[in-house]
Amino acid sequence: MKFVKVFLAAVTFITASVSPAFADAKVEILGASYGGSGCPNESASVSVSPDGQELTILFDKFAAIGNVSAQRRKSCNLSIPIKLPQGFQISLYDADYRGYVAPATTGRLRAEYFFAGNRGPVFSRTFRGETDYNVRDSLATVANVWSACGDSVNMRVNAAMTASGTGMATVDSIDLAHRGLVYHIKYRTCR
């Protein structure tokens, strides 16, 4: 019984000494800038969740057209500034993509994730139309890519859709409530 009391006291002390750092730590996504043939200026809507943990980007023009050579590949490069508490670093946890591929069309979605100055994992998927797709790139299971320690970092995502066939392939959902991309993050103390 004495061991249990000592153990519980130790756990309480450790929790009390560690929790304030995490309770006060606030990772804040500051928004996103974008550019590319699939997301020209003012063609996307950027939204950050109230808790600053999720970023949603809705695209209006991220559509590749298979039978128009100049439109076969569309790309979008994202720059996501994130404010970190001193002594923390972050990792991209997962990314959700939604879109549509027309009949008689094949769409290839490719995305690379990294922090400025580094390389990261690349995901590639092929969809055969007609289909609505909803996929997740689970980065935590294939890569452990962490930012540098500091007050702020710049997360980068380079996404591209290539279409072949007679129709279009989009990164933009027909689902009226949840469209585009959603990024989730995780964070830890610096190592």
Regions found by a protein language model. Name each.
Residues 13-21:
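C-terminal segment of classical bacterial N-terminal signal peptides
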Residues 22-66:
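N-terminal leader/pro-regions and domain N-caps
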Residues 63-65, 157-167:
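Short beta-strand-plus-loop segments that form exposed binding edges in beta-rich domains
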Residues 65-73, 81-90:
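Short, solvent-exposed beta-strand/turn "edge" segments of beta-rich domains on protein surfaces
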Residues 89-102:
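A short beta-strand element within beta-rich, extracytoplasmic domains
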Residues 105-119, 171-172:
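Short, surface-exposed beta-strand/strand-loop-strand elements in extracellular ectodomains
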Residues 122-153:
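Short, surface-exposed tryptophan/glycine-enriched loops
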Residues 163-191:
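Proprotein-processing/basic-patch segments
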